Amino acid sequence: MIEQQKRKGPELPLVPVKRQRHELLLGAAGSGPGAGQQQAAPGALLQAGPPRCSSLQAPIMLLSGHEGEVYCCKFHPNGSTLASAGFDRLILLWNVYGDCDNYATLKGHSGAVMELHYNTDGSMLFSASTDKTVAVWDSETGERVKRLKGHTSFVNSCYPARRGPQLVCTGSDDGTVKLWDIRKKAAIQTFQNTYQVLAVTFNDTSDQIISGGIDNDIKVWDLRQNKLTYTMRGHADSVTGLSLSSEGSYLLSNAMDNTVRVWDVRPFAPKERCVRIFQGNVHNFEKNLLRCSWSPDGSKIAAGSADRFVYVWDTTSRRILYKLPGHAGSINEVAFHPDEPIILSASSDKRLYMGEIQ
């Protein structure tokens, strides 16, 4: 297990955009982890800021321990733990509450881990890697229970089915989208694209796979008919992140054209499926696969950004609710806690932050 340097973040409120509060600066570039941070005794009362709205030990918690860029992060469905992974090939498991201890390290990938997902009940954790494989882990024991081999290049994305038999879809630089049943050795279906696939997800009923890649298009593949059903066009650059809303009607996409879009993926939706466009976050020369996510109730969305800020928008008004500073590198993924108003961010600065949002 790697030795982690766990520190609490500064005990200041996260600052919503356009609200008059004192400026929040968390470990700006060059200041190093923990620079100027105040340590509080466990259970200490906070003297300033708005009332607390979560069960975190402090309004902002810093999780450090990764030895390279952190590409992905996810809360366990029960909300008590989280997983993170990235360039150092390790998957770190953390407690959400208390001191946010890094209580386990999952080793097995020989390349960077590009994406992580828990299945619906949280019993399994899926990881996609540049070692051309997807690993399936028992989230209780930390044991790797399956290794899915078949891609011939980097696996950029994976997503487990929400219900039914444990299926998982994957997307790779080899241009294919694959469907796997983890009870079987090889992929059970393969869809060929002309270009690299950067992001995949299932629709709500898991009879379609949705993929995005460097051809700028979002494709919907029908598993029963084994063919491309329709294509959603609108992005002007590579699609790097996809996320299905909790009720399954809308798809969120993040792309290198510096827009985040919401698409209506219901079966009989109008032909023009793009229903919202959000702006503010940016991609840059690093070309990281910046992901995106929905809040559990669908009222907010969040996206990774190369300008070192976490962006959170109101889904209806499209207004930026929060532009959160703190990281010293590209923010690659942002995740919402399943039960509490907590947001988690993973960054190329090797760190994660957890913070309360009102």
UniProtKB/Swiss-Prot annotation:
Keywords: Isopeptide bond, Methylation, mRNA processing, mRNA splicing, Nucleus, Repeat, Spliceosome, Ubl conjugation, WD repeat. Its main location: nucleus. CDD domains: WD40. The modification Asymmetric dimethylarginine is found at R21. It is found in: Nucleus. One of its GO terms (biological process) is RNA splicing. It comes from the Eukaryota. One of its GO terms (cellular component) is catalytic step 2 spliceosome. InterPro entries: G-protein_beta_WD-40_rep, U5_snRNP_Component, WD40/YVTN_repeat-like_dom_sf, WD40_repeat_CS, WD40_repeat_dom_sf, WD40_rpt. Required for pre-mRNA splicing as component of the activated spliceosome. Component of the U5 small nuclear ribonucleoprotein (snRNP) complex and the U4/U6-U5 tri-snRNP complex, building blocks of the spliceosome. As a component of the minor spliceosome, involved in the splicing of U12-type introns in pre-mRNAs. This is U5 small nuclear ribonucleoprotein 40 kDa protein. The gene is SNRNP40.
